[in-house]
Amino acid sequence: LAQRGSDLLRKQGGFDMYDVAIIGAGVVGSAIARELSKYQVNACVIEREEDVCNGTSKANSAIIHGGFDATPGTLKAKLNVRGNFLMDELARDLDIPFKRNGSLVVCTKDQDRSGLEKLLEKGTSNGVPGLRIIEREELIAMEPNLSDDVTCALFAPTGGIVCPFHMTMAFAENACTNGVKFFLNTQVDTIEKNGDSYRISTLHTDTKNKETFEAKVVINAAGVYADVFNNMVSENKLHITARKGEYCLLDKDAGTHVSHTIFQLPSKMGKGVLVTPTVHGNLLVGPTAVDVDDKEAVNTTASGLDSLAATAARSVKNIPMRQVITSFAGLRAHEDSDDFVIGEVKDAKGFINAAGIESPGLSSAPAIAEMVTDIVKGLLPLEKNPDFVGTRKGILRPNTLSLEERNKLIKEHPEYGNIICRCEMITEGEIMDAIHRPLGARSLDGVKRRTRAGMGRCQAGFCSPRTMEILEREVPMSMFDITKNGVGSNIVVGYNKEV
């Protein structure tokens, strides 16, 4: 059900009429696909990258926000709180790494306490439970490494941390299992109204072949490019600005420096630089917030990374920045209205936007999926899918098992005793599972996002060749076709004796 080339697409009936075509396989598009798969609907997801979770969804703060920052009455406020509420059940059913570690918005000596009081008022209005302002004595007992300048903080116990890769993969895999077709390496070039449906012309980025889709309903979940697709079919133009955020990821030795997610008072550019543990035990610092013209500008900068350390120190002291193991940047899709843009386009019947999904987009994704599905119900006759499977198991992690369980597993499946990634203790069996499960990995980064092989201290310096050998054997595919992250990122280009 996951196709990566036009030849496979033809075999799967890519010229068929779909009830629903979703553009974008990030967390929002994948969540919508999963929600729609609860119904008897012929749906597909069209994604230009070689894998799901390859845009904003792979480069963000990995936070499930409480919902106290959004302006009451906005979609951000409503959908953040609902999405937060849904996370416990989703994490259980779809095996998503998720933890309610709570969040703190700190106020320093040179800041007005009224900022926290306004956030408390907003959060209460939005229906966020358990909010309270706590003073320094209690704060330091909770977080000993807070800056000496911190005087008080807003505590949100429902705030959490999640793995955005696994969250997106879980939605996508479950949707795929329930019959949604995913077309990867498929770039949308044009969308045109064609009677009662839409004609979507695409280019396969790997083969350069062109293909056409027809769909009664189109859902636009294309991140920073959502305005481009909206503006193809509507006179009600959107303008989305790419807002770049740079991050530093620290080694697991630094992962206990804080236990809660530490925010600073938000500004018009966002929630500011945070310091947070991750569900996998690292420490994350970021993001910056700089508007850029280039919707592909995911490069990091020396000035941006330098500013992170200085800004983060205002809330948390002694951050061991020498333990940074990697840095990265992501783009948030900021729409001029400063709110999510979700709904059927007035002058383009059957075209539904899920646009402008910046923070708290990850937190809101499950609720956005519900909202969009309700809109589709008003356009198409949807009946419940009697065969819907609502659960999914993630990749088995031998290092979470007891010694007795691990020995039994290795005796039955020896590949789980062969360590490939020493930093993260990832086995050959886990990588094989990542390749063979629905929407299986076909690149080094695809394996990395599913298993964490290559995410540790050496950043794939040791395990890359061994992971490539497993990809070559299990897909199977030529070593020359294996990429880091899709078209144009091939690892091996020739034999050394021939160069």
Model-derived regions: residue spans:
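N-terminal Rossmann-like FAD-binding beta1-loop-alpha1 element of flavoenzymes
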Residues: 18-44
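Flavin-dependent oxidoreductases
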Residues: 31, 191-196, 200-286, 290-301, ...
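Glycine-rich FAD pyrophosphate-binding loop
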Residues: 38-58
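Dinucleotide-binding Rossmann-like beta1-alpha1 core, especially the glycine-rich loop
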Residues: 62-142, 272-273
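Short beta-strand to alpha-helix junction loop
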Residues: 78-81, 106-115, 155-173, 183, ...
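Helical element adjacent to the flavin cofactor pocket in flavoenzyme catalytic cores
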Residues: 154-216
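C-terminal catalytic lobe of FAD-dependent flavoproteins
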Residues: 270, 279-280, 296-419, 426-439, ...
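Iron-sulfur (Fe-S) cluster-binding segments and ferredoxin-like electron-carrier domains
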Residues: 296, 427-438, 461-479
